[in-house]
Amino acid sequence: MARLQEFYKEKVVGDLTAKFAYKSAMEVPRILKITLNMGLSEAIADKKIIEHAVGDLTKIAGQKPVVTKARKAIAGFKIREGYPIGCMVTLRGAQMYEFLDRFITVALPRVRDFRGISGKAFDGRGNYNIGVKEQIIFPEIEYDKIDALRGMNISITTTAKTDDEAKALLAAFKFPFRN
């Protein structure tokens, strides 16, 4: 079992139950999944960009991502239907907790000029989104072997009903929120 998963069961559930006066342990919010998404608009010109991005995301997440394709043609962006324009991976269970642990303890402190993450990036339904500007903050990516700096979106989906509950859940996992 992952370190953060044990921490959630032993400490976080009790703390959140006391804070929000839940009647059952099943009411306590938990993280359902983490989705990593890389949008690659440059992939229209060069197909190798998709391969490099898939390789990077595989190293970061520990599982192979799905290549996302354009749903409809947009002439202004020179995109036809079915063109590969990004890649994404969904993490659940033990892999999700392992990624979250590495993200909080290793990757976030490596961000340049890091002062904490915004507490306002909740969507109103208890889910949190973080934008990462460069993939080199992850220790699995070797700086010398990348072809270009690429950002990604990390979506954390929780069972929390409100943003306050979700923020309390992520704060219990030691997310470095800005004050």
UniProtKB/Swiss-Prot annotation:
Family matches, as InterPro entries: Ribosomal_uL5, Ribosomal_uL5_bac-type, Ribosomal_uL5_C, Ribosomal_uL5_CS, Ribosomal_uL5_dom_sf, Ribosomal_uL5_N
Gene Ontology BP term (one): translation
GO MF terms, alphabetically ordered: rRNA binding; structural constituent of ribosome; tRNA binding
PROSITE patterns: RIBOSOMAL_L5
Keyword Lipid biosynthesis: no
One GO term describing the cellular component: ribonucleoprotein complex
UniProt entry keywords in alphabetical sequence: Ribonucleoprotein, Ribosomal protein, RNA-binding, rRNA-binding, tRNA-binding
Family of this protein: Belongs to the universal ribosomal protein uL5 family.
Assembly: Part of the 50S ribosomal subunit; part of the 5S rRNA/L5/L18/L25 subcomplex. Contacts the 5S rRNA and the P site tRNA. Forms a bridge to the 30S subunit in the 70S ribosome.
Xref: PANTHER family: 60S RIBOSOMAL PROTEIN L11-RELATED
Protein name: Large ribosomal subunit protein uL5
